[in-house]
Swiss-Prot record:
Name of this chain's protein: Monogrin 2
Subcellular location: Cytoplasmic vesicle, Secretory vesicle; Secreted
Primary localization class, coarse: cytoplasm
Source organism per UniProt: Argas monolakensis (Mono lake bird tick)
Further comment: The monogrins comprise about 4% of the total salivary gland protein.
Length: 107
């Protein structure tokens, strides 16, 4: 896999503010890539298909399960999205396996 990858992700059911207020224990996180964002295996696996081929310092992809997936420029934006989920962060091993599994499904 090209580039430096730091990972975390959320396999979550639909999220509500009320759940977050009660200390939701589900897992949440992000995928951060330092490379050109584009139509890559990693972004396809996450359900993204960027038309734009723009090189930048980093691309942060947040997954929140039932909610739409989002691409941000900074980890701070992802942290804000994941605020309220108190479950343990996914390990890099779990995330790499998730990406591999989804890449097989999306071809």
């Amino acid at each position: 896999m090209e580039g430096k990858v730091l990972l975390c992700f959320a396999l979550l059911l639909p999220f509500t503010v009320a759940q977050a207020a009660k200390g939701d224990t589900r897992r949440c996180g992000y995928l951060m890539m330092q490379r050109c964002r584009g139509d890559t295996t990693e972004t396809k696996a996450w359900g993204f298909n960027y038309e734009e081929k723009k090189c930048q310092k980093e691309t942060v992809i947040c997954g929140t399960g039932g909610a739409p997936r989002n691409a941000f420029e900074t980890k701070k934006d992802c942290d804000a999205l994941c605020k309220g989920y108190s479950g343990p962060q996914y390990s890099m091993q779990e995330m790499l396996q998730h990406i591999r599994d989804n890449a097989k499904k999306t071809g």
